[in-house]
Amino acid sequence: MSKPVNLVLLYGGKSGEHEVSLVSAASVLKHLDSEKYHIIPIAMDKSGRFHRHDYNDLLACSDKLPVVTEKSTPLEGLLINGRLAVDAEIVFPVVHGPLYEDGCLQGLLELAGVAYVGCDVLSSAIGMDKDMARRLACINGLKSARYKLLSWHANASERQQFCHEVASEFGWPLFVKPCSLGSSVGIHKANNMDELNAAVADALRYDEEILVEEFIVGREIELAVLENSIPCGKPRVSMVGEIKVNHPDGYYSYTAKYLESSQTDLIIPAQLNNSLEEQLKQAAANIFSYLKCKGMARVDFFVNDKTEEIYFNEINTLPGFTSISMYPKLWQATGVAYPDLLDELINLAMVHHNCRQHLVTNYL
């Protein structure tokens, strides 16, 4: 029997999605095969400090993993002298939001010379920015909701003018979103000017740039994409899932996702005709390729029920792995069990790492 791979499970973080990470990490820990991997849980608290845990101490934590316990050991940092502070071959990041999904963490791990699960620096950075992701995803004619951007540099007068312009151009309701955040953190539905002003002010608490977009009447559709293990093979796409929100918020808000999820239905497979289903799968695969994604991504769309027009919403290059998260659920429904999915992602990460290690870096 081969020696288990030393694997860091990294979770927590300085992010508005900190709590989501703790739940995702508990689910991943539960499904990782301890005979294949020597699992080293490392948590980052909201101040950016790292804490090492013993795997066996966390086995009873079924709902979410703790950040600090009486038995956890503080680390000076994730890296020491440019290398991981612990002896590990690979890092499985289960962290969300800025610094973790936008290429920063990925670049740090590449500098440390360690393998990591998921998209690389480039695709993470593009995928995290809703504006840039839409520009590339829609390069060949795919639609997205019309939107406008606002920077936190804008003064009060400029913000007020911006709000009047988007309301006049797009009408009500409007959606306000931080440009580089996920899990519906900081997202608001605005039905009037007072709500829009409040939503803009709140969203700018989470990000330096926000977008305000028109409301698309349609079904919320999600697909999971997995890189092909065959070199140059087409991305693998799961069956299609649909999110049906019955929550009073009226959209897939943070509350509807995580706090009151019983009021949201995850429908797998989505009831679509064959032609529309194939169009969505092809669009998801294309977007994965356009953004040069590695490992995994979840691609989200809106579909107009009457016209069957497809609108790209966003791509998530480090999707949630909670028990209710669509990415693992879609693959389970497609025939890929949760533990097998984790194995596949880890194997893909090792392949990319080995490739990077063989690149020439000395030109003399």
From Swiss-Prot:
It holds the Pfam family Dala_Dala_lig_N. One of its GO terms (molecular function) is metal ion binding. Pathway: Cell wall biogenesis; peptidoglycan biosynthesis. Mg(2+) 1 binds at residues 300, 314. The keyword Nucleotide-binding applies. Keywords: ATP-binding, Cell shape, Cell wall biogenesis/degradation, Cytoplasm, Ligase, Magnesium, Manganese, Metal-binding, Nucleotide-binding, Peptidoglycan synthesis. This is D-alanine--D-alanine ligase. The gene is ddl.
